[in-house]
């Protein structure tokens, strides 16, 4: 019975993680998919007892995604007309039936987010490249105190020096990276406080009296959430800040958890 429960637990784990990965893939959120895959890889490396379910998840997800991309019409009923690094720079011609009772094929032009490869190849002229360049200039001009919290968009729209940095795009609401955000709007003072906060948080998780596997999972979650090389939302704006600090609270609780044997 114990062996059967053991197998069932691993099957449930694998199916649950696979479902999450497939939903993330279907959502089209590339950064979410990348960070989820990063989490799976780190957990596979360090959680020895869970490697089987994680490995099954990776293999099963890769197989299902491959089949979906090959078979589902959504990924096959279009042709690429133009692909650039600019915002909405991927232009495709989408084909579909004109109506249900006819085999006549119609088409329409759709503008989508640029491909990841194009953005990397031409990063300086991409939306992220211009936003990060503008943020860096704000930090260099105000290295100690920054431009002031929540002033990024205002200065971009009303200050000629900064507005001219945005050549191909409208001003963004925030710098789209947590660390760059604090540097641009808070300078070294706020950035230093934020780094100190992260160090205290990690120390709290590591030094808790919970089981090591729960502490490690909590640490991995924090590491992925605050991974420096990725685009993010703003911690001081609406849903992103709420969900981030809620997850931090869950990690702090999880790191104190002990299994009942």
Regions found by a protein language model. Give the residues of each.
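Transmembrane alpha-helices of multi-pass inner-membrane enzymes
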Residues: 40-41, 197, 218-230, 234-261
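Hydrophobic transmembrane alpha-helices and their immediate junctions
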Residues: 41, 45, 50-51, 162, ...
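Helix-loop-helix junctions and helix-breaking kinks within/between transmembrane helices
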Residues: 14-52, 67-76, 187-188, 234
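Membrane-interface catalytic loops of GT-C/OST-like multi-pass glycosylation enzymes that act
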Residues: 25-35, 172-177, 230-243
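Long extracytoplasmic/lumenal interhelical loops at the membrane interface
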Residues: 107, 112-141, 145-186
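Transmembrane alpha-helix segments characteristic
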Residues: 11-23, 213-228
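Membrane-interface transmembrane helices that cradle and orient dolichyl/undecaprenyl
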Residues: 1-12, 254-261
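A membrane-periplasm/extracellular boundary helix in multi-pass inner-membrane enzymes
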Residues: 26-27, 47-120, 133-141, 149
């Amino acid at each position: 019975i114990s062996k059967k429960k053991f197998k069932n637990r691993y099957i449930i784990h694998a199916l649950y993680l696979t479902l999450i990965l497939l939903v993330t893939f279907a959502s089209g959120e590339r950064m979410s998919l990348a960070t989820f895959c990063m989490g799976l890889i780190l957990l596979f490396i360090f959680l020895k007892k869970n490697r089987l379910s994680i490995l099954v998840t990776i293999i099963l997800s890769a197989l299902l995604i491959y089949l979906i991309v090959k078979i589902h019409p959504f990924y096959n009923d279009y042709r690429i007309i133009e692909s650039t690094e600019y915002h909405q720079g991927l232009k495709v011609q989408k084909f579909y039936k004109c109506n249900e009772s006819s085999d006549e094929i119609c088409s329409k032009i759709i503008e989508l987010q640029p491909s990841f490869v194009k953005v990397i190849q031409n990063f300086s002229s991409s939306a992220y490249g211009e936003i990060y360049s503008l943020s860096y200039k704000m930090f260099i001009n105000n290295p100690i105190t920054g431009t002031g919290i929540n002033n990024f968009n205002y200065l971009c729209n009303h200050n000629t020096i900064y507005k001219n940095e945005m050549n191909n795009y409208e001003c963004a609401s925030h710098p789209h990276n947590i660390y760059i955000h604090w540097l641009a709007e808070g300078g070294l003072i706020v950035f230093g406080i934020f780094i100190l906060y992260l160090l205290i948080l990690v120390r709290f998780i590591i030094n808790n009296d919970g089981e090591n596997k729960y502490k490690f999972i909590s640490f991995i979650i924090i590491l992925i959430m605050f991974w420096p090389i990725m685009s993010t939302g703003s911690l001081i704006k609406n849903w992103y800040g709420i969900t981030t600090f809620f997850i931090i609270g869950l990690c702090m609780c999880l790191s104190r958890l002990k299994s009942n044997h």
